[in-house]
Amino acid sequence: MRIPITLLQTYFSEPLSTKEILEACDHIGIEAEIENTTLYSFASVITAKILHTIPHPNADKLRVATLTDGEKEHQVVCGAPNCEAGLIVALALPGAKLFDSEGQAYTIKKSKLRGVESQGMCCGADELGLDELQIQERALLELPEATPLGEDLATVLGNTSLEISLTPNLGHCASFLGLAREICHVTQANLVIPKEFSFENLPTTALDMGNDPDICPFFSYVVITGISAQPSPIKLQESLQALKQKPINAIVDITNYIMLSLGQPLHAYDASHVALDSLRVEKLSTPESLTLLNGETVLLPSGVPVVRDDHSLLGLGGVMGAKAPSFQETTTTTVIKAAYFLPEALRASQKLLPIPSESAYRFTRGIDPQNVVPALQAAIHYILEIFPEATISPIYSSGEICRELKEVALRPKTLQRILGKSFSIEILSQKLQSLGFSTTPQETSLLVKVPSYRHDINEEIDLVEEICRTESWNIETQNPVSCYTPIYKLKRETAGFLANAGLQEFFTPDLLDPETVALTRKEKEEISLQGSKHTTVLRSSLLPGLLKSAATNLNRQAPSVQAFEIGTVYAKHGEQCQETQTLAILLTEDGESRSWLPKPSLSFYSLKGWVERLLYHHHLSIDALTLESSALCEFHPYQQGVLRIHKQSFATLGQVHPELAKKAQIKHPVFFAELNLDLLCKMLKKTTKLYKPYAIYPSSFRDLTLTVPEDIPANLLRQKLLHEGSKWLESVTIISIYQDKSLETRNKNVSLRLVFQDYERTLSNQDIEEEYCRLVALLNELLTDTKGTINS
């Protein structure tokens, strides 16, 4: 779309420079560029205002003028008779190239005239090659008071236009009024409605035309008699030509100009070809051919919106009128129509029959429904200026325009989450009101009424974008927004820790083939998903994929596999599917010794140690960790268990069943653990990391051996002591567990080491002995019920 800068300036309370207009368009999100169709022989000549002048100290006929271009001041020596303060003139800067009366080029330089420095030259019209504008000999070219300062003179004098491209969400900018309104929102200028669009409203008469409300909820027209197809005034023709519109006749030119100015398409019919009593808008029931205004004959498919009467089709609704009933050279009575077509209806029509037109461009993006009648009234006033004797009927209207504005709630917390910056409700209200919205503060949000011309505002995120328009993109005080979710950060930190600790990270696919899934021998319901010809099942455990990868590595002469994987496993619970973020650790023994050193052996406790190291790394206390027996078919029946934290199942671990390892073609023992990272992430959210200083006083310890039944976990004794709340008991460590298989009693000896510590003083033997005896007494109560004894 093309808009002359001079025409756009009439909508602003104060002139804006071309740079300001371009910056405003960029801020709005409009692609804009300047197009100048007039060529001048000068360059580097700008507009400047004379602030003040003083007589030249060494020359009676010269004056020293101080000028401003809006940003910088310039001192120029000038001899023109009209060099006075307050004038806006043409200032040639050093480096500017001008031409003399003989056509010879010369360059303006910074120089001294009679001892006073001159930083350029104030130009007369003849010095710029604009002899027709020279009104007095040796006089300066005087520019209008509204001329913006610092602008290139060629841009100011030339036929300069703004060429813009609109995205589909900016339909409200597809007119002079709409674009000027948006520019005013992001600049300091106020919107001014030109005088030709300021008038009293005309009376309207309601009709029931039977229009399809799903296509055209509002339709209006006026009948004007006593007009002709005479040319429009020269000024209007020049305006249309600057807009790349071909002048046709007064009536058609007025409808086109109002569409470009206000954004409301109008159409003029020859009244003798329209049956007003049956005029309506509806969907075409059967395909018909129609010759359009552009002379093209098209076959209209059924379902497209049309304007018609009982006798003929009058046009393709919202797109283009038919040629036969259009305004003719012989027309003396016209029907001018203005309507509101729903954007979704016109978009559907354009898919069925894509015919580009200025009307379709605006209707598909959405026009202001409350501007339909005012645009028709503007056309009437324009016509009366050209045809004062014309007779005007009342404005007839059918349908209703929804006067209720859309309401959308905006919450400050949404802006904080998305932009990383907090706004009060009062500030949000001020910003949105400056953009033309009405606001009502609520307790925790702002209720925003959307103007009728803003079809792009439908939900909260749209208002967030509007707030972005009021903010600089270079917000230095903006709080950094975390880009990662807690579970993502946990997975990265865990992977880094395990890799640094010596494990290798494996990556296996989520989709497995049925043969690999069968390795786990689980009886869970499988989730099928066709990934390729062979991979059809989503994994319910990381074990099958890791077993297959481990076997591949061992078969390629890897001495052992010490690996981990972090991935998603899938489970089905009834009709619902659940995804769980999981960590798996897989360890295998070395196949053979490669040196004189003995082979490092692996056991169930090696695997448990890795889990405990991981928890310790994440600052989780292993005191809350309990190991319970399990009966999972994937593991060795006597070397497996379930780890629980606060009674929640957190991990399964053990030696992979030998038959399963053999089935996977692995000859050596395999140990496997699978941890629920989602549960671990929830625990970390509840964990408070506190600094614990190093002790500066020595600690003391006592060793204790207990005889307990073999089914009592040693860790139970340890936790019993730690949970008693002793103020000096620093730690309890299991030293050894011994069981004599030759004895008939099924007991075992558990040796514990109790460390006592005070961070404020050195404990005496008496303090330690008293606390030790108290803890032993507590254990005696526990062992009395289990027939255990304390040996030392």
Swiss-Prot record:
Residues of the B5 domain: 403-480
UniProt xrefs under InterPro entries: aa-tRNA-synth_II/BPL/LPL, B3/B4_tRNA-bd, DNA-bd_dom_put_sf, Fdx_antiC-bd, Fdx_antiC-bd_sf, NA-bd_OB-fold, Phe-tRNA-ligase_IIc_bsu, Phe-tRNA-ligase_IIc_bsu_bact
Database matches in PROSITE patterns: B5, FDX_ACB, TRBD
Keywords: Aminoacyl-tRNA synthetase, ATP-binding, Cytoplasm, Ligase, Magnesium, Metal-binding, Nucleotide-binding, Protein biosynthesis, RNA-binding, tRNA-binding
Top-level taxon in the UniProt lineage: Bacteria
Coiled-coil stretches noted in the UniProt entry, renumbered to this chain: none
UniProt-listed SMART domains: B3_4, B5, FDX-ACB
Main location: cytoplasm
Ribonucleoprotein found in the keyword field: no
Cysteines engaged in disulfide bonds, as pairs: none
Amino acids binding Mg(2+): D456, D462, E465, E466
Gene Ontology CC entries for this record: phenylalanine-tRNA ligase complex
A GO MF label: magnesium ion binding
Catalyses which reaction(s): tRNA(Phe) + L-phenylalanine + ATP = L-phenylalanyl-tRNA(Phe) + AMP + diphosphate + H(+)
Gene Ontology BP, a term: phenylalanyl-tRNA aminoacylation
Result, substituting C577Y: In strain: CWL029 and TW-183
Cofactor note as given: Binds 2 magnesium ions per tetramer.
Any matching Pfam family: tRNA_bind
Subcellular location: Cytoplasm
Every FDX-ACB domain range: 695-791
Stretches assigned to the tRNA-binding domain: 39-154
EC number: 6.1.1.20
PANTHER family on file: PHENYLALANINE--TRNA LIGASE BETA SUBUNIT (PTHR10947:SF0), PHENYLALANYL-TRNA SYNTHETASE BETA CHAIN AND LEUCINE-RICH REPEAT-CONTAINING PROTEIN 47 (PTHR10947)
Family: Belongs to the phenylalanyl-tRNA synthetase beta subunit family. Type 1 subfamily.
Quaternary state and interactors: Tetramer of two alpha and two beta subunits.
Protein name in the entry: Phenylalanine--tRNA ligase beta subunit
Gene this chain is encoded by: pheT
